[in-house]
Amino acid sequence: MMQVWKRSRNIGVWVAAIAIAGGLAVCAVLPASAEEAGNMVFYRGGFTRLSSDRSGETFANGSTGQKNDSNIGWYAGAGLDFLLSKDTWGAMDKTWAVGELGVQFNRFASNSVRGAGVSGSTTDVKTQLTMVTIDVSPKIKFREGQALRPWIIPVGLDIHVISPPSNQTQYLDIGLQFGAGAEYQVWKAFKVGLDARFHLAAGMTNTTNNYFTVGPYVGVSF
């Protein structure tokens, strides 16, 4: 358990360093060097935390009292931003409406347990607690023409797949996500950013699938 917390602390240090670098960029905000096309492909990764662990479930735990009782881990994902409007359909100047299509893999802290689920194994094997999230979300991106651009996701749609399945062998869930972040134009089409998101799931698997993420991303506009 201590090793898990140490790894999470190290991730937090990296995230803090990126946030500091972003703060320095704020002090020297420069106009963007060229007109942005509006579309972007991006890659994300960082720290994730479930609202509740899965230690009370048959498929996650072992037959000898061992438990997968941690709710922290990491995530990696990618997505596409598609420009919808450069003035939010006339509502706000220099404020873009962007549509995000993303996919994300979450791997929560996993332990070696004996005979998890229905395997009947007599040896300890690692049971991976994972979740895949596919999202379609609107982004409101502010400060057109500037190198540093904050943005928000007012509310987005999530589809979740959990593994292992719940006690009722269900694995599909639906939910909402809320997020905020900022990105900095490093050079031409290349950008770096930092975001934080909360995913609120419906619980259709009879498990609590809500989780939080924070981490950096890199993007290329096109």
Please annotate each region the language model reported:
Residues F47-R49, W74-S166, V214-G215, G219-F222:
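Gram-negative (and chloroplast) outer-membrane scaffold detector with strong preference
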Residues L24-F42, K86-W96, Q146-A147:
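Outer-membrane beta-barrel biogenesis signature
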Residues E36-A37, L50-T58, T64-Q66, K94, ...:
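Predominantly the C-terminal beta-signal and adjacent terminal strand-loop region
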Residues M1-G38:
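Cleavable N-terminal export/targeting peptides
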Residues E57-Q66, R114-T122:
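Solvent-exposed loop segments that connect transmembrane elements
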Residues K67-D69, A147-R149, I162-P165, V186-G193:
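Substrate-binding/catalytic groove segments of enzymes
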Residues I134-V136, P154-I159, L172-A182, A196-F198:
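Hydrophobic alpha-helical segments of small multi-pass membrane proteins
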